[in-house]
Swiss-Prot record:
Source domain of life: Bacteria
Protein name from the UniProt record: Lipid A acyltransferase PagP
Encoding gene, per UniProt annotation: pagP
EC number: 2.3.1.251
SUPFAM superfamilies per record: OMPA-like
Catalytic reactions of this protein: a lipid A + a 1,2-diacyl-sn-glycero-3-phosphocholine = a hepta-acyl lipid A + a 2-acyl-sn-glycero-3-phosphocholine; a lipid IVA + a 1,2-diacyl-sn-glycero-3-phosphocholine = a lipid IVB + a 2-acyl-sn-glycero-3-phosphocholine; a lipid IIA + a 1,2-diacyl-sn-glycero-3-phosphocholine = a lipid IIB + a 2-acyl-sn-glycero-3-phosphocholine
Length: 209
């Protein structure tokens, strides 16, 4: 019951982020000048496109939650700090064994692409607990005759909370990639950053039950 409530909450707070992952929001003209017919037509088209993305996002979240095809167990596997962007004395102190676990629900759509809602907790670089949860999408490819073998590429949008940020919810929008066979997937993301900050590869196993 607690997991279900958590996933519902994450679905609601993640929803506003997803449309912005696929297009940039156009600036609003506040000059007060009269718009040309072409400008009005362009704004109308933009509004319809915005509504289309918004409706699609709501549909994907609703369908994933209400018509999920599997329940998933998440097992964090590795965090790796990019050695080309860190001083050695820092990486020597960081934890790269993200012990933890997670739970989620997922489905494949009519195109065979993956959608998932998840919540996971793991030990971060400072060996402190870090929860993360949200929505994930992957375009799936099946490069061989064996349809159980799949490659995925997409994004995840959601929220995380860290000890060094006083566990304030932080929105995240990150790339997502995977290699899957049957019910087992190895998924990964890369957190970009600056020198001695960010630039972390994070991966986990996902098992459909």
């Amino acid at each position: 019951m607690h997991l279900k409530r958590a996933l519902i909450t994450l679905s609601l707070i993640t929803l506003p982020i997803i449309p912005f992952s696929s297009y940039a929001v156009e600036s609003i003209n506040n000059t007060g000048s009269m718009e040309s017919p072409a400008s009005v037509a362009a704004d109308s088209t933009s509004n319809k496109q915005d509504e289309s993305w918004w409706q699609r996002s709501k549909h994907n979240l609703s369908a994933t939650w209400n018509t999920s095809q599997s329940h998933d167990i998440y097992i964090p596997a590795i965090t790796w700090h990019n050695r080309w962007t860190y001083d050695k004395e820092k990486t020597d102190k960081y934890n790269e064994r993200p012990w933890g676990a997670g739970y989620g629900v997922s489905r494949l759509d009519q195109d065979g692409d993956w959608h998932g809602l998840y919540i996971m907790a793991f030990k971060d670089s400072f060996n402190k607990w870090e929860p993360i949860g949200g929505y994930g999408y992957e375009k799936r490819w099946r490069p061989t005759h064996d349809q159980d073998f799949q490659l995925g590429l997409g994004f995840t949008a959601g929220f995380t909370m860290r000890d060094n940020w006083n566990y304030i919810p932080i929105p995240v929008l990150l790339p997502l990639a995977s290699i899957s066979y049957s019910k087992l997937s190895f998924q990964a993301t890369y957190i970009p950053g600056t020198y001695n900050n960010g630039n972390v590869f994070f991966a986990w196993f996902r098992w459909q039950i």
